[in-house]
Amino acid sequence: MSAKVLNGTELAAKVKAGLKAKIDELKSKGINPGLAVIIVGDDPASRVYVNHKKNDCTEIGIKSFEYALPESTSEEELLDLIETLNNDASVNGILVQLPIPKHINEEKVIAAISPDKDADCFHPMNVGKLMIGKPEFLPCTPAGVVELLEENGIEISGKNCVVVGRSNIVGKPQAILLLAKNATVTICHSKTANIEEVCRSADVLVVAIGKSEFIKPEFVKPGAVVIDVGVSRGADGKLVGDVQFAEVAEIASAITKVTGGVGPMTRAMLMKNTYKAVLLQNGL
């Protein structure tokens, strides 16, 4: 393997250490940050993610409020809880763990969160501010990808960046953040013609489609940087990404692994957004 493996775990620890120092300073002034996490139903993957987030909060001194609601929770009950948290001064950030049950309107739930407590940066107002280049918060996974690139000395400005995937959570905001860093950005999706050729034009290739090992070596230009955001389970039940890691690592100059890559950075950016929310709400 010739590619450098970009270590998200190490960088996330560094980010969180910096945040802990800032949060300790806030606490010395009587300001105690709090993040509310709502999970509806008992999806095992969601439960793992929520536990990770709770541990991150504990690590850096943010109080974690967890609301584990049954699958049968009505939309009205969930919206009522969000309204209560919107009006709770001890809660600075609110996160609803997705996915939520199909009988609840996801868009309505996201829009119900107060924009200044929107730790995930999913609220339409925050997405709009992101689009015009004046964000209060940054979407967690895309921001984590950019920080991982920059902290490893990987140039973005003037580079051809290809994003595979057009979701509202990763693909679209990822393209916006790369564009803000002066990259030339192309988005690929299921209807893209000659997707292999387009991917091969990338200096930086970010893949977020949730298709197990979709990106093969022939999709990658020698020396390209490959960021694998996707996570799924292979036939053997093991976690795999959207990229054929071992094979692509022989061609790329830098690459992320499924574990210890983008995931820890996503959570570190959630902590950063929660800290920003505290500053925003306290006029700091």
Swiss-Prot record:
E.C. number(s) listed in UniProt: 1.5.1.5, 3.5.4.9
GO CC, one annotated term: cytosol
Binding locations of NADP(+): 165-167, 190, 231
Catalytic reaction list: (6R)-5,10-methylene-5,6,7,8-tetrahydrofolate + NADP(+) = (6R)-5,10-methenyltetrahydrofolate + NADPH; (6R)-5,10-methenyltetrahydrofolate + H2O = (6R)-10-formyltetrahydrofolate + H(+)
Coiled-coil region: none
UniProt KW rRNA-binding keyword: no
Keyword NADP applies: yes
InterPro entries: Aminoacid_DH-like_N_sf, NAD(P)-bd_dom_sf, THF_DH/CycHdrlase, THF_DH/CycHdrlase_cat_dom, THF_DH/CycHdrlase_CS, THF_DH/CycHdrlase_NAD-bd_dom
Molecular function, one GO term: methylenetetrahydrofolate dehydrogenase (NADP+) activity
Keywords: Amino-acid biosynthesis, Histidine biosynthesis, Hydrolase, Methionine biosynthesis, Multifunctional enzyme, NADP, One-carbon metabolism, Oxidoreductase, Purine biosynthesis
Associated pathway: One-carbon metabolism; tetrahydrofolate interconversion
Family matches, as SUPFAM superfamilies: Aminoacid dehydrogenase-like, N-terminal domain, NAD(P)-binding Rossmann-fold domains
GO biological process: L-histidine biosynthetic process; methionine biosynthetic process; purine nucleotide biosynthetic process; tetrahydrofolate interconversion
Similarity section: Belongs to the tetrahydrofolate dehydrogenase/cyclohydrolase family.
Function: Catalyzes the oxidation of 5,10-methylenetetrahydrofolate to 5,10-methenyltetrahydrofolate and then the hydrolysis of 5,10-methenyltetrahydrofolate to 10-formyltetrahydrofolate.
Family annotation (PANTHER family): C-1-TETRAHYDROFOLATE SYNTHASE, CYTOPLASMIC, C-1-TETRAHYDROFOLATE SYNTHASE, CYTOPLASMIC-RELATED
Subunit structure of this chain's protein: Homodimer.
Protein name as catalogued: Bifunctional protein FolD
